[in-house]
Design a protein with these regions (language model features):
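Bacterial N-terminal signal peptides that target proteins for export
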Residues: 1-11
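Short, positively charged
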Residues: 10-12, 34, 192, 208
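Domain-terminus/edge residues, biased toward the C-terminal soluble/receptor-binding domains
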Residues: 146-149, 153, 157-162, 166-387
């Protein structure tokens, strides 16, 4: 990936924060070294928080483990049910009965943060939403995510779906260490579905030197959540940021924390695994009034500002300096075996069905949108947008 060094580096006399100097931040934060697990900064790491679409990281992790166990393959069919199709945005908008490959479904879930596709993945891998949530919770217990509970695979609000910044750090380490082959999916700049370009909601990707992941999340009670990662000189740092007030501010905070981490001469001695619980660990914070009350609909969206004048004037993030690389995804091409959970329920294998018509959230006028070269809907093909 081509990067321009957007970051204005701190001067030699700048103060470098560490675990001994707490950041002046309002909400939960954990910054850590991926390889060692050493924590560079943390604040309210055990505070219960609504994960929103960060839940999709656990959905991905459960699915990666199902692939490793032989329950499903990357080219296995994921069928959109009536239930999954009815999930609210952010969504792809495919009709019930639509079928896609699992790998394409996961990319839509991670890049577009599509709630309908996350639910479809959960239903197909687990057999039902409830059964998949049980698997999510079982993995959380196994990993030691003691402040976490899930009821759905997409992160739509429920008072019973919660996590902590520390637990999310544990999950990130499990994903990146156990399944490095999927790491490129977390740094995809955008998707191409036919002629439609879908950008990644993660404003670090392509805008912050070394950025390579991972996920954003938003519901009104949670505020704007983000897990951002970056690698420089072989060192990967991760920032977990919860409860920011906008898509822009969460990216700016994550970038600032990552930059402070890379500038730190050494990491702290405390690791994610041994960090002892502290503070309030039982009550959940609800930001609904602060984030969504008296806000216009577009201000409640997961998506960042769409127009240039709304772009932040920040030393940490700027516009892309290159044409985004899009990964082509779509329906069809599912030639692999049906998921084990579906077969166990007596379902029949469905593969390579006719491609249904794509129903976007908002119809696109004919002749508009970027042209996409090499936009094959199957597998890991990438394409460049052309003006």
């Amino acid at each position: 990936m081509r990067h321009r060094h957007f970051l204005k580096l701190f001067s030699a006399g700048a103060i470098v924060l560490s675990v001994l100097a707490r950041p002046a931040l309002a909400n939960p934060v954990v910054v850590f070294d991926l390889k060692s697990g050493q924590i560079l900064q943390h604040q309210d790491a055990f505070k219960r928080w609504y994960p929103a679409s960060l839940s999709k990281l656990m959905t991905a992790y459960v699915t990666f483990r199902a692939i490793a166990a032989g329950e499903i393959q990357l080219d296995s069919p994921i069928k959109v049910t009536k239930h999954s199709a009815a999930e609210p945005p952010s969504k792809m908008g495919f009709k019930p009965g639509s079928v896609m490959r699992l790998d394409n479904a996961l990319k839509m879930m991670l890049v577009k943060s599509a709630n309908d596709i996350a639910m479809a993945v959960g239903e197909n891998v687990g057999g039902s939403q409830a059964a998949f949530a049980e698997r999510m919770n079982a993995e959380a217990v196994r990993l030691g995510m003691n402040g976490t509970h899930f009821v759905n695979p997409n992160g739509l609000y429920s008072p019973d779906q919660y996590t902590t910044a520390r637990d999310l750090a544990v999950l990130v380490m499990a994903i990146r260490r156990e399944f490095p082959q999927y790491a490129p999916w977390f740094s995809i700049e955008g998707l191409a579905v036919g002629k439609k370009a879908i950008p990644n909601y993660n404003l670090l990707i392509g805008r912050y030197p070394g950025a390579d992941g991972m996920k954003t999340g938003f519901v009104c009670p949670s505020g704007f959540n983000m897990i951002g990662s970056a690698t420089r000189n072989g060192r990967t740092l991760v920032a977990v940021v919860l409860g920011e007030k906008s898509a822009v501010s969460r990216a700016e905070t994550a970038a600032k924390l990552l930059d402070q981490g890379f500038d730190a001469p050494v990491a702290g001695s405390t690791t994610v695994a041994i960090l002892a619980p502290y503070g309030d660990t039982t009550s959940s914070n609800d930001m609904s009034d602060e984030i969504c009350k008296k806000k216009k609909p577009h201000e409640q969206s997961e998506a960042p500002p769409a127009v240039a004048k709304d772009a932040p004037k920040s030393p940490y993030q700027e516009k892309l300096d290159h044409v985004p690389t899009l990964v082509a995804v779509g329906l069809g091409g599912a030639t692999g075996p049906a998921p084990k959970a579906i077969l166990d329920q007596g379902g029949q294998e469905y593969a390579d069905v006719p491609i249904p018509t794509w129903r976007p959230d908002k119809p696109q006028p004919a002749g508009t949108g970027p042209k996409v070269a090499g936009a094959d809907a199957q597998g890991d093909q990438s394409a460049k947008t052309a003006n």
